[in-house]
Each structure stands twice: as C-alpha cells, then as structure tokens.
C-alpha cells in the first residue's frame, strides 16, 4: 500500500471450524523472504497502524528441532522490544512436548532461562520508525532510530543457516518500508 508492504492479521482470535470439530487458530500475518544468511543486518521502516506487534524473524525450514524451523526473532511493540532465541526456547520441539506435562514445569523454566530478553521502549501509533536487527554469531541487537534498545546472546541465534527472513504483523495492520538486508562477514 503506497509503496510499502502492509501486513494485516485477518483472524485475531481462535475460532471453531465450520464443522465444529477443530479450532482455527489466530496467527500473525507473515511475509517471508527466501534469503539465506548467517550474520546479517536487517533494516526496515516500521509503522504501527492498529497492530499490537511487528517482528523480524529468522528461520531454517530444514531444521527439525524447532517448530517450523523457527530460530530467532525481534518483536517490536509500542511499549517493549523482545528478542527471542526460539530454537533453544519457545519453539524448541523438546520444550513444547515437555510443556504438555505439568510435572515438567520446573525443567521447562530452567531450559527457557536466558532464551529471551525484553526491554522497554516508548513508540507511538501511526509513527514510522527505522528498526535495525543485527545478528552476529550468537548475539542479536536491535536499534530504533539509531538508538540501541535490545540485546540477547543465546545459542540459537548463532544457528549456522538462516534460510528465511520473515516480517510479521499481529493484531491488525502495520507497514514495512525500505527493507534492506546485508549479509555480514
């Protein structure tokens, strides 16, 4: 829209299927770039137009140790930025299985420790921000309008092959513009 990539989440809550036998789950709107990287810099202009979250995500679809090959992501909300190592944390298949067993709650918490970090920010609806996500080895940094706002060092970030970069929008609409990606040495 107007030269920008607009994402709109069309289903914001889980709903029963028409036959009532299953549930259709809400999911963020996602645009994937088939762009292999290891160490990279992703720069994008983000604009919140009713959405609650926008993100830059790194995946490896051939990796089976995490759901859908999710590796890491930087989530930006109006009040916070969260960096997640999904390979070792929330999307790790072993951890997802352990979460189904209430007796494993302590073990899940132990394994999840250090796989995400959240930092406060103050952003405004309708404003455009330049967001830069840098991954080098097992470290990810996020800056907004030239100011460093978030950092995480965790093993999954250093995954050898990130075959896909995804841009996501949750909770209605948001826009990405001037998308730039550099592979770092």
Residue locations for each model-derived region?
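Short, solvent-exposed beta-strand-to-loop segments that form ligand-recognition rims
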Residues: 138, 143-165
């Amino acid at each position: 829209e107007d030269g920008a990539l607009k994402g709109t989440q069309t289903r914001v809550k889980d709903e029963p299927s028409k036959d009532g036998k299953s549930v259709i789950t809400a999911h963020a709107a996602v645009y994937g770039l088939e762009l292999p990287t290891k160490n990279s810099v992703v720069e994008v202009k983000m604009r919140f137009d009713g959405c609650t979250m926008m993100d830059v995500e790194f995946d490896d679809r051939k990796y089976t140790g995490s759901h859908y090959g999710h590796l890491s992501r930087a989530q930006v909300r109006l009040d916070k930025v969260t960096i997640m190592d999904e390979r070792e944390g929330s999307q790790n298949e072993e951890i997802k299985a352990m979460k189904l067993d209430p007796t494993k709650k302590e073990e899940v918490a132990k394994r999840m420790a250090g796989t995400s970090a959240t930092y406060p920010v103050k952003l405004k609806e309708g404003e455009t921000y330049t967001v830069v996500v840098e991954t080098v080895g097992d470290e990810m940094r996020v800056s907004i309008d030239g100011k460093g706002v978030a950092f995480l060092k965790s093993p999954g970030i250093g995954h050898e092959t990130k075959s896909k970069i995804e841009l996501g929008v949750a909770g209605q609409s948001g826009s990405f513009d001037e998308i730039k990606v550099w592979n770092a040495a």
